[in-house]
Amino acid sequence: MCNSKPSSASSSLLSCKDKTHISKLETCDTDNPHYSEFRDTDSLDLKRWPSFLEGLEEVKAIGKISGPTAMTGLLMYSRAMISMLFLGYLGELELAGGSLSIGFANITGYSVISGLSMGMEPICGQAYGAKQMKLLGLTLQRTVLLLLSCSVPISFSWLNMRRILLWCGQDEEISSVAQQFLLFAIPDLFLLSLLHPLRIYLRTQNITLPVTYSTAVSVLLHVPLNYLLVVKLEMGVAGVAIAMVLTNLNLVVLLSSFVYFTSVHSDTWVPITIDSLKGWSALLSLAIPTCVSVCLEWWWYEFMIILCGLLANPRATVASMGILIQTTALVYVFPSSLSLGVSTRISNELGAKRPAKARVSMIISLFCAIALGLMAMVFAVLVRHHWGRLFTTDAEILQLTSIALPIVGLCELGNCPQTTGCGVLRGCARPTLGANINLGSFYFVGMPVAILFGFVFKQGFPGLWFGLLAAQATCASLMLCALLRTDWKVQAERAEELTSQTPGKSPPLLPIASSKSRSTSGTEDMMRTMLV
């Protein structure tokens, strides 16, 4: 086995046989009869199960991307916890105001920026597989411009947050603290508009370790920054917000320096011209549904907190919900990293015209996701009587947490495969299908079940989690149905059409399916009929 380096122009972990396979594809002529014979042979691979060695090789390939990505996720999670600790150090009012502002920022800003940035993932991943390197640079420029333009109206909403919160009936003191926090956090929006595309740009080229190292350095500096601004300079809530901004600034500087000084950009760099403002149809057709999908899932948890406030003893239920959401956020790091890894693998393979390899990646990743779900479920059941003690000593909150944790574990059993499935759909450039599945599962199934069990059947706090369980089970089932019916040859053809763009030409609107495949791509139509 001869593996390429992560930063090389070829996909990682390709065997010598695979490289020969690539060279055949590069030199073949589609009008040559041998090309059809090659495609017919490839069709046989699209119907068989991968061998043990193929599966092991794919696990290694996904692990090289997902492993460092998981470490990066854990580091970012620890950064959020450090910020919460310093807010708690300032007092109960500051903790409440900071928590409220972060929730508002998640709904109105961070979810939007994160979701829109992921629209570039299939384009860059497939372009890297197809060796259309200039398309990576052009897509990076377009995505940064898109995110920066979206950050401006979001900033204005943050400037008026106090008025919005008071209109919603929030406490005046807490609203004032939240307004102060967000006022100093506005630069974070513009930094994330650079940071998210940079990370995706590197990951789609199988470059992940430098991102992890840069994140580790930034998080290590996050503690002294908070100490200096909050404790020494006594800047209060503003100090916590400024520390968050400076940490992201450090990360942007470190990643930009890596890209520049290692010449990672040399093959992908496109001069900034008027072309950056043209041909946005393909990017927007992916970014908008991806953003909708991300926002639908993020917003669900905020709605759950609102519903908790309507239950008996809202103080205990809201506190317990906060603990459990922090727990699911920690667990989510692992399926999310697997999702990002498989998205990169599938987009690379489809771009390189290897649909059989993309199918293998899907199969292996789903088995890995099921294993992760089982581990998460066992973990939740085993720690149900002890986990809450890490956050509080209140007996009622501890009781609610211990009752709900096994249900949370069952939710993760569905969440891990469905999150991985979303990664597969992103790699195939099919985010609209993922958005429709999320909409139907969380809001047409999960929300009614949560209200029914929580309030009508008087199950209270656990009833709300039954709603999430119903949503995750539905989402995983629909996602599995869509993936099993995927025509991988069609997806390779779509990838070829997407990556045939060249700088200077406006790309066509990305099709849902090519004209050849309308009879074989009924999954999308079926899902739209069911869920919209």
Curated annotation (Swiss-Prot):
GO terms for biological process: iron ion transport; regulation of plant organ formation; response to abscisic acid; response to absence of light; response to heat; response to nematode; response to osmotic stress; root morphogenesis. It is a multi-pass membrane protein. Residues 496-532 are annotated as: Disordered. Induction: Induced by excessive iron, but repressed by iron deficiency. Induced by heat, darkness, osmotic stresses and acid abscisic (ABA). Residues 514-523 have a biased composition (Polar residues). Signal peptide: none annotated. It is found in: Golgi apparatus membrane; Late endosome membrane. Highly expressed in shoot apices relative to leaves. At vegetative stages, highly expressed at the stipules. At reproductive stages, most highly expressed in the mature pollen. Also expressed in the tips of sepals. The chain crosses the membrane at residues 65-85, 95-115, 136-156, 174-194, 211-231, 235-255, 279-301, 322-342, 363-383, 397-417, 437-457, 464-484. Pfam families: MatE (PF01554). Keywords: Endosome, Golgi apparatus, Membrane, Transmembrane, Transmembrane helix, Transport. Its main location: Golgi. GO terms for cellular component: Golgi apparatus; Golgi membrane; Golgi transport complex; intracellular organelle; late endosome; late endosome membrane. InterPro entries: MATE_euk, MATE_fam. Disruption phenotype: No visible phenotype. GO terms for molecular function: antiporter activity; iron ion transmembrane transporter activity; xenobiotic transmembrane transporter activity. Plants overexpressing DTX48 in initiating leaves are short, produce leaves much faster than wild-type plants and show enhanced growth of axillary buds. Overexpression of DTX48 alters shoot developmental programs leading to a loss of apical dominance phenotype. Functions as a multidrug and toxin extrusion transporter. Contributes to iron homeostasis during stress responses and senescence. Could be involved in specifying the lateral organ initiation rate. May act as a negative regulator of hypocotyl cell elongation in the light. Belongs to the multi antimicrobial extrusion (MATE) (TC 2.A.66.1) family. This is Protein DETOXIFICATION 48. It comes from Arabidopsis thaliana. The lineage of its organism: Eukaryota, Viridiplantae, Streptophyta, Embryophyta, Tracheophyta. The gene is DTX48.
